[in-house]
């Protein structure tokens, strides 16, 4: 190593050409490299690839090739210690000598032999402010999970180098800080549907249960507040709905549940435990040792249920997950993709997985594998947010679906559907009174009860079972 910190390329292990890459990963590397070569030193590139597509593999190989071809060092920024460790491990597998800069690291001198650094954003920011870290000859900064805004505070220290942001969703976590303010180019990788069709990701089947969200409040971050979510999802009716959805669509499958509050998750734990199911709870308060034990239990238990809050949306990879339950609503497209992506890993015995949506998220964002115009979202994020369906509009489109266990009680009835909205519009077009529609609904319910009852008392009991159908 020379005095100015330039790396001697002969020091880099060139006997290994890196790991085998999938064709779409190699194509992405070529496109990103082309963009980086074309741009000036202070221009930045954003790379989009779905969760499960191997973003860490791609930027680790980019790091290896960049160091080898330029003689400059690479800095990789993460916001979670789990991602920090995973990235460092992957770089090592690519024969890239690297150093983790976390809270345990108090200083870094310039006379180190590392060719790459993996840093926690807050730690690095503090050490740079304290002038306890010297990072000379950095030619490329890679930002993992680049849609988080916490990384922006570090950009001022690297104004003369290229920055490569990596994310599954090129949409900022804050509407006030769009990503196109910091990145000039967007490179779009393989789509979810393409990765599914080529068997790189599992195919999702989504079940959506309609939920009234009119009590939820939106916070300053643009998403639903924890407090209002706890009030909705912590009540008995929603806990009962969650268990019913699990039993209808996921019973006996390894299931990961996402919540928007710790109290809700503990409630989920208690409810499932009381019903006799194997379940564990996980949040950021759990010790590292206990967390390892819980995740090992989850890995080894075929029908395990894990209820969680926030902690497993990034930096967690358990390919054997068979069902994802969204026991929350979100207005964050990034979070929506992150949560569902936790079930998308392929194994030799798993090519499909289920998604149970209890937050109207499907109606808000569409199917997980549906086409998305990422260029439009990157260039015009405000318009994207403006075009999102409101909860009121979503709920006006709801059509009641009778649960399977209730449908069995009305098995003798061929027709159980009555579109109240369509019937109302039809009645109005004929100049009829709205009571005509109510009468039709009563007639239909009466007919269903008579068809499936042995006597009057049975019919009355069946009528009580239809209370949800009447309310919805």
Pin down the residues of each PLM region.
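Walker A/P-loop
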Residues: 39-62
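Conserved Walker A/P-loop ATP-binding site and its immediately adjacent core
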Residues: 57-58, 67-93, 262
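Conserved helicase ATPase core of P-loop NTP-dependent helicases/translocases
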Residues: 85, 100-111, 129, 266-270, ...
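Post-DEXD/H (motif II) to motif III coupling segment of the RecA-like Helicase ATP-binding lobe
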Residues: 147-206
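C-terminal helicase lobe
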Residues: 300, 334, 344-461
